[in-house]
UniProtKB/Swiss-Prot annotation:
Has three domains with a flexible linker between the domains II and III and assumes an 'L' shape. Domain III is highly mobile and contacts RuvB. The RuvA-RuvB-RuvC complex processes Holliday junction (HJ) DNA during genetic recombination and DNA repair, while the RuvA-RuvB complex plays an important role in the rescue of blocked DNA replication forks via replication fork reversal (RFR). RuvA specifically binds to HJ cruciform DNA, conferring on it an open structure. The RuvB hexamer acts as an ATP-dependent pump, pulling dsDNA into and through the RuvAB complex. HJ branch migration allows RuvC to scan DNA until it finds its consensus sequence, where it cleaves and resolves the cruciform DNA. It is found in: Cytoplasm. It comes from Thermotoga maritima (strain ATCC 43589 / DSM 3109 / JCM 10099 / NBRC 100826 / MSB8). Disulfide bonds: none annotated. Residues 1-64 are annotated as: Domain I. Keywords: Cytoplasm, DNA damage, DNA recombination, DNA repair, DNA-binding. This is Holliday junction branch migration complex subunit RuvA. The gene is ruvA.
Length: 188
């Protein structure tokens, strides 16, 4: 799997980027709208990526941060919701707001997003609410920042996620949550 791509943006066409790595390999990467707007043609970028293989072909999706990628992956697990629809959802709302909408079971808010029917919004909430509620974390930004930090330190994502869930207390700052999660992980 290709987890990330670092390189120079050769060309932008809508939400599709051509990124050349230092080794000279050029990747075609489909991004959400915000990520595409953030990168400049001719500029350097790093994208968190997901390689999708389906009967329609192979597509490399790119995101400016890990939270967007994680949300995209969660959305693609929803029945009858493919990567194209997941990308469309992420392109129309910021990740923190989407996570909050799902955790608070805001079907009405989700169904207002372009291309999302009420039934699709209900399915998203039904299938993902536990994933976001189980963390018991009101501020998902702190949760994801802490998770990213632990993963970047080399902890497997599953262990990092469990540690963050176990030690989180409402009102914690990101640095406190990381510190407590590291203590938890060191005692395992």
């Amino acid at each position: 799997m290709i987890a990330g791509i670092s390189g120079r943006v050769l060309k932008k066409s809508g939400n599709v980027l051509l990124v050349e790595t230092k080794s000279g390999v050029v990747f075609e990467i489909v991004c959400d709208v915000q990520t595409s707007e953030e990168v400049k043609e001719g500029g350097e970028c790093f994208l968190h990526t997901f390689l999708s293989v389906s009967q329609d072909g192979i597509t490399l999706y790119g995101f400016s941060n890990e939270m967007k990628k994680e949300l995209f992956l969660s959305l693609t697990k929803v029945s009858r919701l493919g990567p194209k629809t997941a990308l469309k959802i992420i392109s129309n709302e910021d990740a923190e707001t989407l996570v909050a909408m799902i955790a608070s079971q805001d079907v009405e808010g989700l169904s207002k997003l372009p291309g999302i029917s009420k039934k699709t919004a209900e399915r998203i909430v039904m299938e993902l609410k536990d994933e976001f509620e189980s963390a018991g974390i009101k501020d998902m930004r702190i949760y994801h920042e802490s998770l990213e930090a632990l993963v970047s330190l080399g902890y497997p994502e599953k262990q990092a996620r469990e540690a963050v869930k176990q030690v989180y207390r409402e009102g914690m700052k990101t640095s406190e949550l990381i510190k407590e999660a590291l203590k938890f992980l060191s005692h395992r």
